Amino acid sequence: MDKLSGSRPRLGPPLPPPRCVDSPGWREDAPSPSFLPAPGTWRHKAQEEDEEENKYELPPCEALPLSLAPAHLPGTEEDSLYLDHSGPLGPSKPSPPLPQPTMLKGAVSLPVAGKQGPIFGRREQGASSRVVPGPPKKPDEDLYLECEPDPVLALTQTLSFQVLMPSGPLPRTSVVPRPTTAPQETRNGTADAASKEGRKSSLPSVAPTGSASAAEDSDLLTQPWYSGNCDRYAVESALLHLQKDGAYTVRPSSGPHGSQPFTLAVLLRGRVFNIPIRRLDGGRHYALGREGRNREELFSSVAAMVQHFMWHPLPLVDRHSGSRELTCLLFPTKP
């Protein structure tokens, strides 16, 4: 052996000497020079660490029965609510009885429960946030629409804003006193009487006008220059046949006999000038020419007008050439 050991190099550390039972260096109670601790030392250290962890987690253990312990109990209302949000509902299986937890398991499960607590709280807040902003006050609006209005307010609105309110049956219309037929009849009688009086008062004013026109017509029929039954064509033909400057005649107007009942026709230089005669103030005055003149002369009758221009020149304006000429009424003509 010595030769073999001397010839080959020894690998690894030197072997320990053989163990002797009687040797004091190998007794169990003697300290061992080995680097590995004894089994008892590991147990002691584990117990110390457990005690330290238990001491560190003691404050959460006191608050555990108040808020977190009911969240993990099966069969409670909170547990069913939590399961409703976490996953689909299914047939609940009876859970086996839980064994009595040791100090180590309680210490280990405390952080898990502490972590699950805020999750449960956040889910409750999420559920509450989904429930609170739900339908935006539809029941209040429906209730407001179904509520009957105050009769005083409804009556005031219907009396003051009838144009804006839609036509329809108003609530409690019996409050509004309906007018009787007697005032309406009296008002109708008053209106009829007023209209009759107005017609009676207007009749005298019309009668003088009619009588004045009748008297005027009777006076005109006796005049040598009035052509009562002739139209424009007949009058112009008669004047052109005469061929005298200053020949004239008065005829009824071709249009409706309103404010221009007559027309004065005058011949000058081979042309016939037709000038309207206007009636003013209900037949009390007459004017020659169309409206809008700056200066016009008023006459009491058509005969007074013809007599005036028999001695005063009458200005005549040609519409085509714009030339202006003067002439007097010299030759009365009657077709």
From Swiss-Prot:
It comes from the Eukaryota. Residues 202-212 have a biased composition (Polar residues). Residues 1-139, 166-215 are annotated as: Disordered. Signal peptide: none annotated. Transmembrane segments: none annotated. Keywords: SH2 domain. Pfam families: SH2. CDD domains: SH2_BLNK_SLP-76 (cd09929). GO terms for cellular component: cytoplasm. This is SH2 domain-containing protein 6. It comes from Homo sapiens (Human). The lineage of its organism: Eukaryota, Metazoa, Chordata, Craniata, Vertebrata. The gene is SH2D6.
